[in-house]
């Protein structure tokens, strides 16, 4: 089978590849994989088998919630209400949060604290065989005080994870935006971009990491030479490294993988820099990386950056884990690029995004199967990608239980795909955020928008759940 990575329509033909330098660097040969045909023994049509472990009460609630989030005007109304001044009134706020907690929150979130979330992880595993990814649901921090509070919550997450059998838990998740002030991440990203454009530009605070840019990376965020970090900014960056180090150490001691979530391209260079620094520091076990970074396949530079990071990790003999996703900031990325007079960094068509995801998936699976220190979590709600991944694993003869390859979906979404992959023998996990109801509102609104419309992510689940409910009622 031809080993070719990243198709010509996704990555141009380049002459060289370099981790540093202006965007004139290009890959000599396109390393793209011939994708397997999606036909595979992954049956997503037999709803009775897929939802056999789900009680009828859960099916009823899930169907109702997914149906509600598919109605555009209802989603818009809910989003408006959550951000309106009505929420400033105690009575209204308490009423709305109680309703949300008993419906959308319980469907998409794991609990209000780490202990409750750990119990939910065990409950889900015992009833379905699906593992859990535990994540404290806070997203951003504006100052060092908030970062200090958040890192304690992430440490609590690891402590809760330690109480679970290893078979129940896939990993814990940390957001760099919650442990480093946003303004510092933006400044670091600007300086990293400027150094990439001007390799002689010195960054005295910079630690050892892998490449975070490629010839296709968007650099328009930084149009002039940034000021050096102030003493206070350097101090905050050092504190952020210490916070990340503290949670990495606990994960390493407990043998619990740590996934680092991605953000938009304004901040992503700094996040990649910190993720790869921590991978170099803590990924010492050749068979099981501790630190995983996230690759967003909807970005045009995703394949090149993945290739460069992997090449550097192999050079340094550092194992690395990746979580592969499509991406969640399409609208904001397009708006920012347009406002600055540039093309969006996101692929021009959804098919190009699908192709990039599937190519990166095939490439990573090849790497993971050949005994290298690569581990991959294939986070997808796309059934074709699920089928392609299952077929690729079969072609490569991958041991489905070896822990080097895993599929994942969000808790409360794409259950049919999760159950289908699990029935096919794969390790499958659910991304399970936890935290107080009010802090989960932004997350819940995003899930609602993803499910709206007849062709949304939740369409297959809604269809199969209704079919299974009808079958069970008719069987009475």
Swiss-Prot record:
Its main location: mitochondrion. Induction: Down-regulated by high succrose; via the repression of bZIP11. Up-regulated by proline and salt or drought stress. Coiled coil: none annotated. Disruption phenotype: No visible phenotype when grown under normal conditions. No proline hypersensitivity. Its cofactor is FAD. Pfam families: Pro_dh (PF01619). Pathway: Amino-acid degradation; L-proline degradation into L-glutamate; L-glutamate from L-proline: step 1/2. Gene3D superfamilies: 3.20.20.220. InterPro entries: FAD-linked_oxidoreductase-like, Proline_DH_dom, Proline_oxidase. Belongs to the proline oxidase family. Converts proline to delta-1-pyrroline-5-carboxylate. This is Proline dehydrogenase 2, mitochondrial. It comes from Arabidopsis thaliana. The gene is POX2.
């Amino acid at each position: 089978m031809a080993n070719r990575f990243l198709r010509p329509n996704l990555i141009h033909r380049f002459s060289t590849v370099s981790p540093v330098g202006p965007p004139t660097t290009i890959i000599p040969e396109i390393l793209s994989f011939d994708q397997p045909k999606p036909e595979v023994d992954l049956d997503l049509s037999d709803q009775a088998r897929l939802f056999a472990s789900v009680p009828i009460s859960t099916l009823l609630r899930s169907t109702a919630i997914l149906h509600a989030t598919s109605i555009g005007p209802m989603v818009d109304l809910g989003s408006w209400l959550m951000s309106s001044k009505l929420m400033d009134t105690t009575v209204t706020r308490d009423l709305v949060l109680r309703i949300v907690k008993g419906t959308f929150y319980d469907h998409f979130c794991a609990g209000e604290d780490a202990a409750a979330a750990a119990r939910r992880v065990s409950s889900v595993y015992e009833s379905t065989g699906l593992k859990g990814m535990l994540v404290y649901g806070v997203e951003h921090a504006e100052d060092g005080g908030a970062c200090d509070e958040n890192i304690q919550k992430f440490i609590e997450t690891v402590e809760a994870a330690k109480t679970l059998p290893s078979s129940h838990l896939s990993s814990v998740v940390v957001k760099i935006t919650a442990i480093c002030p946003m303004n510092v991440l933006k400044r670091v990203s600007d300086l990293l971009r400027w150094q990439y454009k001007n390799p002689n530009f010195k960054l005295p605070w910079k630690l050892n990491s892998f490449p975070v840019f490629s010839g296709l990376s968007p650099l328009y965020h930084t149009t002039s030479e940034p000021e050096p970090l102030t003493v206070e900014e350097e101090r905050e960056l050092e504190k952020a490294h210490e916070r990340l180090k503290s949670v990495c150490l606990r994960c390493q001691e407990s043998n619990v993988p740590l996934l680092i979530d991605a953000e938009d391209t304004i901040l992503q260079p700094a996040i990649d820099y910190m993720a790869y620094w921590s991978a170099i520091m803590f990924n010492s076990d050749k068979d099981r990386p501790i630190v995983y970074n996230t690759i967003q396949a909807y970005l045009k530079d995703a394949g090149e950056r993945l290739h460069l990071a992997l090449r550097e990790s192999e050079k340094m003999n550092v194992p690395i884990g990746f979580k592969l996703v499509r991406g969640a900031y399409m609208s904001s990325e397009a708006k920012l690029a347009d406002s600055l007079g540039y093309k969006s960094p996101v692929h021009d068509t959804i098919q190009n995004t699908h192709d990039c995801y599937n190519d990166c998936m095939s490439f990573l699976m090849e790497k993971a199967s050949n005994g290298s220190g690569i581990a991959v979590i294939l986070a997808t709600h796309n059934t074709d990608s699920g089928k392609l991944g299952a077929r690729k694993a079969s072609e490569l003869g991958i041991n489905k239980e070896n822990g080097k390859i895993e599929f994942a979906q969000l808790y409360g979404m794409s259950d049919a795909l999760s159950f289908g992959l699990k029935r096919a023998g794969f390790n499958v996990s659910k991304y399970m955020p936890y935290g107080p109801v009010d802090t989960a509102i932004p997350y819940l609104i995003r899930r609602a928008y993803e499910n709206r419309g007849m062709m949304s992510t939740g369409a297959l689940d809604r269809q199969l759940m209704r079919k299974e409910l009808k079958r069970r009622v008719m069987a009475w």
